[in-house]
């Protein structure tokens, strides 16, 4: 089957690599003139690694990633609240540089099949084909089109004109440092406070990925102008680990993005066009499942196309992925609302509830991620 993938991000490259493995004629179209990745660290859950094992993609990610055993949650006063145990039942979770993950995925797609400077402007469908039109004048026809063109997807906007990114109410800064803290190498740490959150996550070779989130207006000019000294001043009352990480951060290399998600869609399929990853179900990063859910989409779609006729495969993909990713979006949104509250009373209640909850009970709240259907 001749298949086009729109977008060469994590979801698009995973889908292309898997479909190439299973014998399809695949082309990836990327609007940019390069494949450089902007990002810091990314989490890959055990649910995702399990899904990839049958296609021999998991091994390289496990080798290049850092095992993550536990995420400890503390208050901004360094008070222990709870811990999410990650590697239960021998389920491996890893963290990895986004650009390293991207390079791994890229090796599974023939170089000549990734076409840069191809910005999609329009598509037209017949019952059994899709014709694509690009800004550079190229036109091509395919049996199936996979839209993995991100949260601001041109394809999704064409299918659902009213589906636009929904601002979550907070902005996020991120970076990577080489700094030794009083942490186990497989242990992450999050501080939840009145002024926001600060997370510290291990990467391979003693590097640390850090992030912080602060409540803000959309496109807030105050935070757009933030540099290292501003972050140091903002978090100067947070525990010493936070200050050490920010001190270690280079002046350059700090990323800032406002956080968005999508209102869950009723369908990811329109004829022979299928949405995948952020184009279908962009979520806030509170569960660390953005990249993972895109990869799960790709695995599920590949499994189904291998076992069924195209119409049946797309119907099944639509049914199981819309249901599962809706739960992820809403759960992540709920976590963000609780974690980002600046109300003294709500923080007091939240912290008290977290301390009362057992670690096992906390882990059970995300156990549904392990039960995703992949075909």
Language model features with spans:
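Conserved N-terminal helical subregion
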Residues: 3, 20, 45-174, 219-232, ...
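Histidine-centered metal-chelating micro-motifs
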Residues: 152-153, 172-174, 196-199, 280-281
């Amino acid at each position: 089957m001749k298949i086009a993938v729109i977008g060469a991000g994590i979801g698009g490259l995973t889908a292309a690599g898997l479909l190439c493995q299973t014998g399809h004629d695949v082309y990836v179209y990327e609007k940019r003139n390069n494949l450089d990745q902007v990002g810091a660290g990314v989490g890959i859950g055990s649910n995702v690694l399990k899904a990839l094992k049958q296609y021999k993609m998991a091994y390289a990610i496990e080798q290049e990633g850092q095992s993550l055993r536990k995420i400890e949650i503390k208050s901004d006063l360094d008070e222990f609240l709870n811990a999410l145990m990650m590697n239960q039942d021998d389920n491996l979770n890893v963290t990895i540089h986004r650009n390293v993950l991207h390079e791994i995925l890229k090796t599974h797609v023939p170089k000549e099949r990734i076409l840069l400077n191809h910005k999609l402007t329009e598509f037209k469908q017949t019952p059994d084909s899709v014709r694509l039109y690009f800004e550079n004048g190229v036109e091509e026809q395919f049996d199936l089109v996979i839209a993995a063109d991100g949260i601001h997807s041109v394809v999704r906007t064409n299918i659902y004109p009213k589906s636009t990114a929904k601002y979550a109410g907070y902005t996020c800064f991120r970076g990577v440092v080489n700094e030794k803290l009083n942490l186990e190498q497989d242990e992450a740490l999050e501080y939840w406070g009145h002024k926001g959150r600060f997370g510290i996550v291990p990467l391979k070779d003693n590097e640390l990925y850090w992030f912080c989130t602060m409540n803000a207006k959309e496109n807030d000019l105050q935070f757009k102008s933030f540099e290292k000294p501003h972050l140091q001043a903002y978090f100067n009352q947070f525990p010493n680990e936070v200050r050490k990480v920010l001190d270690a951060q280079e002046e350059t290399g700090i990323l800032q993005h406002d956080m968005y998600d999508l209102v869950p869609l009723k369908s990811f399929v329109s004829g022979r066009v299928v949405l995948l990853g952020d184009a279908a179900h962009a979520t806030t990063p509170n569960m660390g499942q953005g990249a993972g859910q895109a990869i799960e989409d790709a695995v599920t779609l590949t499994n189904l196309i291998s076992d069924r006729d195209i119409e049946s495969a797309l119907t099944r993909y639509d049914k199981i992925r819309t249901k599962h990713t809706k739960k992820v979006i809403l759960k992540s949104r709920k976590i963000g609302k609780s974690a980002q509250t600046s109300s003294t009373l709500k923080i007091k209640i939240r912290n008290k509830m977290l301390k009362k909850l057992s670690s096992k009970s906390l882990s059970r709240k995300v156990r549904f991620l392990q039960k995703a259907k992949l075909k």
